[in-house]
């Protein structure tokens, strides 16, 4: 990593509680959390936004959210993000078939029409040489209302923030997803 984490005792007490919970849940503390937590106000904002986007009552299915986060992570070369989000995709879908086919989703029969338009939208937002068109937005509207499109756009934007942060700071994968 290009910036190292501080010793745990140097983080505020409430962040140490968060780290304790991560260690209990994942058997380790996530490196990006330790980096964001060097600036506690940023950590709090990022954690709140992530929790809002990944809530149970989201209009986006858990599998769809995972497909989006893995694809953005692939594009932005975030090895940590591909690791953790692929692990979540496996847990949510029960299979890594779509995860393994994600880089070539356009040529795969594994993805339904909704997933394909969402992945096209994801790429249009993430790649800097692409634009979201009115035609693409019209196809999205076949599957989502305005609030759903806003949530999807927010998720894509958040994952771009997260994956670019982790990629720039060279956060390594932590072994969450062991693909056979």
Residue ranges and their predicted role:
Residues 68, 72-86:
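Short, thiol/selenol-centered motifs that function as redox-active sites or metal-ligating centers
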Residues 41-44, 82-101:
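Iron-sulfur (Fe-S) cluster-binding segments and ferredoxin-like electron-carrier domains
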Residues 26, 57-74:
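Immediate flanking context of iron-sulfur cluster ligation sites
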Residues 1-60:
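Mobile cap/lid helix-loop segments that border enzyme active or cofactor-binding sites
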Residues 113-154:
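Acidic/histidine-rich alpha-helical segments that form the ligand environment
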Residues 36, 50, 67-72, 102, ...:
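Short alpha-helical scaffolding segments that buttress acidic/His motifs in well-ordered protein cores
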Residues 146-180:
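Preference for long, well-ordered alpha-helical segments
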Residues 102-113:
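Acidic/His metal-coordination segments adjacent to aromatic residues that form catalytic metal sites
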